[in-house]
Amino acid sequence: LRELRSSMSVVVTQGEAAALLQAAPRLGRLPVAALASTLEQKIVPIRSIREVAIALVSEGVDPFIPAVGLTSRIETQLEPGAPTQEFELIGAGIFRGDRLVGFAPLDLARGLAWLVDEAPFAVATIEWPPEGESSPREARPDVSPPEAAAERDAPPGSRQPSPGQGMREPNQISPLVLRAHVQFHTEIEDGQPVVHVYAHAVDDIVTNQAGLDLTDPAVLPRLEDALAARIKDRMEGMLHLARELGADVFGFGALIRRNHPKLWRELRDDWHGYFSRLPVQIHVDVRVQRTGLTNSPAIFRREQLRR
């Protein structure tokens, strides 16, 4: 019998695992090669057999494994009649001990990556202006304030592209994470542990479809705050899901075990129960390092285009 290498990556799926091996990826690639390419995007942290085994036998941490599914794809002229299935990351499988107790969707799995200090160096997209904020004139030079407010309040699917807008999605900013680092600190308050998570990121703006004037000193801090809020929302959403499932996939218990061994001996027997009410404070700081070659887009207002 051949022994499995402990460095091999593992995945879970919501259906039968055999379906993944029977997929026919495009360009004639082997399923295992296409699956490896999907995992290498690292949107969800990769886990090897060794890492899962260590989590299973360690105190204060539960394992998680990237979740992969199959999606249909459009048939092309280069591959007529080819099977229309391709691999896609759908999130992460959450374990409590050795039992799979739930799945985190992809959006929350991005927050999981931050909470285990493995933030993906990938492009994300946020809507501008942030929800609940107004659209000042300097924020959208191509849209008058009344038009921007009407766009924001319109029901989904009702927006129509305006002249010069083409097929692009309005009001979107896409940053690329260049560097990211997360620090964890614990302290004791009233005899109970509190975990503080400090996330720091340096971003590059790769697309500015909202037409923001990034040379304006008043605009860039608002954008950085919006990016930080987006990351924090994902982290808090993932934390809420993990608490509901009673699975400490972040290793907060192991952190307390290292920093406060005496307190850990009191909590270890019912750690999963205590984890659901563990106070966790999340702090996120984002700095935009580069804003791209076009800092002040040459965009006409829509009423000018109509004339």
Please provide the spans of the model-predicted regions.
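A glycine-rich, acidic short-motif signal
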Residues: L1-R307
